[in-house]
């Protein structure tokens, strides 16, 4: 939410840094970074709504998607949400990675102020699990496709594996290692 009370939401990756401690990396130019720098507070909405994911990625959600809370951007259909107060905003050294050539970004460190579960089984999505599912689907097709398509699947595996090592829990990382070993046994050259 902006300092002027304009609510917005966008998918971001949150990393658990310890008990009641969260962190994230936000790139310069995003509304989220601007708002967090201005207000030093934000809400992590946990939702499974694919329409909200798309709309909040390509633009902003309609005001009707948010609750009537005056000072927080809480989604009406959130499975759960976490209110965070920023403890530190640190500019990262410029990096060149798969996302951007200049890598101008900030690391946001936060304390969890409150956790609200609207549904008893609320669980955050992790893109690593979906990347694993993509890799598993591609794996089942490796013996059925052309060499060109195999190379594409291997490239996707390598990229997904790199990402999973950064954003996923140990179970997903271990699952990718098992899949990698099986691919190597089949004669595929994976990283």
Predicted regions and their residues:
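Basic, polyanion-binding surface patches
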Residues: 1-81, 85-191
């Amino acid at each position: 939410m902006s300092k002027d009370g304009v609510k917005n939401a966008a998918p971001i990756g949150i990393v658990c840094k310890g008990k009641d401690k969260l962190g994230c990396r936000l790139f310069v130019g995003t509304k989220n970074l601007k708002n967090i720098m201005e207000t030093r507070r934000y809400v992590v909405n946990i939702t499974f709504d694919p329409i909200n994911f798309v709309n909040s990625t390509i633009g902003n959600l309609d005001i009707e998607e948010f609750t009537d809370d005056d000072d927080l951007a809480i989604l009406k259909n959130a499975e759960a949400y976490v209110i965070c107060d920023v403890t530190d905003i640190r500019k990262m050294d410029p990096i060149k990675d798969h996302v951007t050539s200049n890598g101008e970004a900030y690391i946001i460190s936060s304390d969890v102020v409150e956790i609200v579960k609207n549904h008893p089984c609320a669980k955050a999505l992790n893109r690593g699990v979906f990347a694993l599912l993509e890799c598993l689907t591609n794996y089942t097709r490796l013996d059925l496709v052309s060499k060109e398509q195999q190379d594409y699947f291997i490239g996707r595996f390598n990229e997904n594996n790199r990402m999973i090592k950064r954003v996923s829990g140990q179970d997903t990382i271990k699952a990718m290692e098992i899949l990698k070993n099986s691919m190597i046994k089949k004669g595929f050259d994976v990283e």
